[in-house]
């Protein structure tokens, strides 16, 4: 039996901020099951999460993690830290290792004491703290190539956003299980900001316009 699956997601750290981006396509075997699949979730005021893999498993994790974050805030009066949230998720996944959640997850957050934090987790609870960038899903090999070529830890947030979108766009062009739009979030000391489709489209148009100008200049040089 085929289940709905999510695909390419990207996370990166730059200039004291975390950027998360995902595509919107959910596939079921060779069928595009959903063109508006939600793969980017706000867990807390300073934490967001991306999903790739089984949609049902991932949504169950999101519900559980969101409830735990709210419960933590009720008990302590503080927001749960990104590290504590990632560790909790790692423990949940590991405790279910014999019947694993079929999903890969990226947690991005901002710790008011330690700054931007990024974690990747596998279905068995393996957790890595990422110091630069990470990607998950079937389109991740393509996304990694773009990230490797363009990443700079000290790049401003605006350039980091463009790089994340370029990585997603490249994956969507080459991976059949990725596509149908992009979701984007930036996490800073101000909190989680999830971008509207119109804002993302505007940035993508700027990237495309800049790319066309570079191509035109190269063509002119060759013709000379």
From Swiss-Prot:
It is found in: Cytoplasm. The gene is psmB. It catalyses: Cleavage of peptide bonds with very broad specificity. The keyword Hydrolase applies. It comes from Methanocaldococcus fervens (strain DSM 4213 / JCM 15782 / AG86). GO terms for cellular component: cytoplasm; proteasome core complex, beta-subunit complex. Keywords: Autocatalytic cleavage, Cytoplasm, Hydrolase, Protease, Proteasome, Threonine protease, Zymogen. Pfam families: Proteasome (PF00227). This is Proteasome subunit beta. The lineage of its organism: Archaea, Methanobacteriati, Methanobacteriota, Methanomada group, Methanococci.
